[in-house]
Design a protein with these regions (language model features):
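Active-site catalytic microenvironments in core metabolic enzymes, especially phosphate/sugar-handling
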Residues: 1-254
């Protein structure tokens, strides 16, 4: 019999919880660690849409990237998503920054999708081990590379375009820290990709001649949800694993 704890222990073995950023929340967040698991649902976020789909599909456990409990809760009342999840009897596990850092995790999946080879970690001060990756691609014009990113991730990119030929690329799925572009540039990056970029970081990228591509938080992390599903399905082949329905949180207007 597979239990919630078994799934959590396996995730801990491939994406150790102790590699998460200090401010993060990973592991079993809601539920019974000894509950039997016959069906797991996967999603980037635990939203009301995701929970409804999980209930409809009779899942025992939801595994998400982003934690449903991130900051201390001041109340736990009916109508609160965490309360509704607990009442449903479904358990929840988060594999957040530990899976960003992991081999085969968020940033390795991004590199594979975009054809980035010979990757190494990009150090940062927030996590015990590097989250971001930097590697090589076949030389391509910056605008053409940005178009490839948009097409591959089914997104719209906002770009600080250096106009240079791109040979070395750094990636950080989700929201890369402010120093990500500077560290990447020092490591020889011609371009960086992340989900969210602040205005002053775009300005800085232009000043140092670095192509900076903002490709969307959801879009840069969501592909890794399928990867985590595959890893768990391969380990526990007697447990049914499904992707839960989750709409993109934003749409393009104009």
């Amino acid at each position: 019999m597979v239990k919630v704890k078994d799934i959590s222990d396996f995730i801990d073995s491939i994406a150790p919880y102790n590699t998460k950023c200090e401010w993060d929340n990973c592991g079993i967040l809601i539920g019974d660690k000894n509950k039997e698991v016959k069906k797991i649902g996967f999603a980037l976020d635990l939203t009301s849409e995701v929970l409804s789909d999980a209930i409809e599909n009779n899942v025992d456990l939801i595994v998400t990237h982003h934690p449903i409990i991130f900051r201390p809760m001041k109340s736990f009342l009916k109508g609160n998503l965490a309360y509704d999840l607990a009442v449903s009897g479904i358990s929840a596990i988060s594999a957040h920054t530990c899976f960003d850092c992991a081999k085969g995790g968020v940033n390795d999946v991004l590199c594979d999708l975009l054809g980035i080879k010979n990757t190494v970690g990009v150090p940062d001060d927030e996590c015990p081990v590097p989250m971001a990756r930097i590697g090589e691609i076949e030389p391509v014009k910056s605008e053409d590379f940005a178009k490839k990113v948009a097409e591959t991730l089914d997104t719209v990119c906002r770009v600080a375009d250096s106009g240079k030929v791109i040979k070395k690329v750094a990636v950080c799925g989700g929201s890369g820290p402010d120093d990500f572009i500077f560290t990447s540039a020092e490591m020889g990056a011609d371009a960086v990709i992340t989900g969210e970029i602040k205005h002053h970081i775009f300005l800085a990228a232009n000043e140092i001649g670095l192509t900076a591509i903002q490709a969307g938080h959801f879009e840069t992390e969501n592909p890794a949800v399928s990867a985590l599903k595959k890893y768990i399905n391969n380990k526990f082949n007697d447990v049914e694993c499904i992707l839960l329905k989750q709409s993109k949180p934003t749409k393009i207007i104009g």
